[in-house]
């Protein structure tokens, strides 16, 4: 019998969750999909993939016995929703960021542990086949010791309402850098090339992270780009690996002036792999109950908090210069 899944939040990314779940339903891994969004108009799109639709989470949990609930709503709602929904399901999938502060993240993790539940936070690039293949190649020493990571995520989409580029995109770069360096904790962070919208929300930025061992990561993220740029480049002592995150099946390796393309067979989209991971039996002793590990979840929030703090100072300086 497949799992019964609820999805709270049916916006652009919520619909991607519903599409993925619909495919998993055809494979027999899911028996029912129940969608929820506070906007009634979302019914039209959601009903293409979900068995039912409602406009509040209380109705969702009252009408259905749920195994898993995905929270795909604005970040400022994640904490309260997660704390409430953990009383009604065995697992939660919370899109990143898990919350807006380390306190919120710790509170959710504590509730997961208290209820003996499972938690998956949507650090999706940890499930990207090409990134994981690149890390495997790096461990063989083919490009030498990993020294630098360049992470680019520029989209030609317009920013959403009340945007925060750190919570929406930079968090992917921070987590991917730490993950690629073997869960290494950064030492310092600086923010440059900052662009704010009319309401002083950050919409473009470049983050520079340093790590122990003279390692570094440069993260460039933003909306309103001229074209899409979704590249991650790994720089080793004797070569490079380029990953296009828009595809999970290919990477380009350059060593000693030679280039080769590595094609990954039977690659699946990262969101599909996230759901497959979460759908493994809850009593699977080999699987972590919380993923990424709690310290990695909190680490990402910590550095996003620091980035937000830095731009508050920058915003004040901009105001003073205008005056």
PLM regions with names:
Residues 30, 88-90, 115-117:
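A short helix->loop->beta-strand "cap" motif at the edges of active sites that frequently abuts
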Residues 76, 99-157:
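A contiguous active-site-proximal alpha/beta segment in oxidoreductase catalytic domains
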Residues 168-248, 275-285, 322-323:
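Contiguous beta-strand/loop segments that form the cofactor/metal-binding neighborhood of enzyme cores
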Residues 1-48:
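N-terminal Rossmann-like dinucleotide-binding module
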Residues 16, 41, 262-276, 292:
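Active-site loop of classical SDR/Rossmann-like NAD(P)-dependent oxidoreductases
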Residues 68-73, 212, 277-323:
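C-terminal helix-rich "cap/oligomerization" subdomain common to oxidoreductases
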């Amino acid at each position: 019998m497949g799992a019964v899944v609820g999805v709270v939040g049916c916006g652009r990314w919520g619909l991607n969750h519903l599409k993925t779940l619909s495919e998993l339903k055809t494979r027999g891994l899911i028996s029912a999909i129940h969608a929820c969004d506070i906007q009634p108009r979302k019914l039209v799109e959601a009903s293409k993939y979900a068995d039912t639709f409602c406009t509040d989470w209380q109705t969702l949990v009252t009408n259905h016995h749920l195994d898993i609930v995905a929270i795909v709503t604005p970040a400022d709602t994640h904490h309260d929703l997660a704390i409430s929904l953990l009383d009604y399901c065995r697992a939660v999938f919370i899109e990143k960021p898990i919350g807006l502060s380390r306190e919120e993240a710790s509170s959710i993790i504590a509730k997961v542990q208290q209820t003996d539940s499972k938690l998956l936070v949507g650090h999706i690039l940890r499930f990207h086949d090409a990134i994981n293949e690149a890390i495997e190649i790096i461990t063989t020493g083919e490009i030498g010791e990993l020294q630098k990571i360049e992470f680019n995520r520029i989209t030609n989409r317009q920013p959403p309402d009340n945007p925060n580029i750190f919570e929406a995109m930079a968090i992917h770069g921070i987590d991917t850098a730490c993950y690629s360096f073997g869960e290494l904790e950064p030492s310092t962070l600086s923010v440059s090339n900052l662009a704010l919208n009319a309401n002083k929300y950050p919409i473009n930025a470049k983050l520079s992270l340093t790590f122990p061992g003279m390692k570094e990561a440069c993260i460039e993220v933003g909306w309103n780009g001229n074209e899409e740029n979704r590249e991650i480049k790994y720089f080793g002592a004797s070569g490079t690996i380029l990953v296009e995150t828009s595809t999970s099946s290919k990477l380009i390796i350059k060593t000693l002036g030679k280039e080769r393309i590595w094609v990954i067979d039977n690659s699946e989209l990262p969101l599909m792999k996230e759901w497959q991971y979460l759908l493994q039996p809850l009593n699977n002793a080999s699987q972590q109950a919380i993923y990424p590990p709690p310290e990695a979840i909190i680490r990402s929030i910590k550095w996003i908090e620091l980035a937000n703090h830095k731009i508050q100072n920058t915003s004040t300086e901009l105001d003073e210069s205008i005056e």
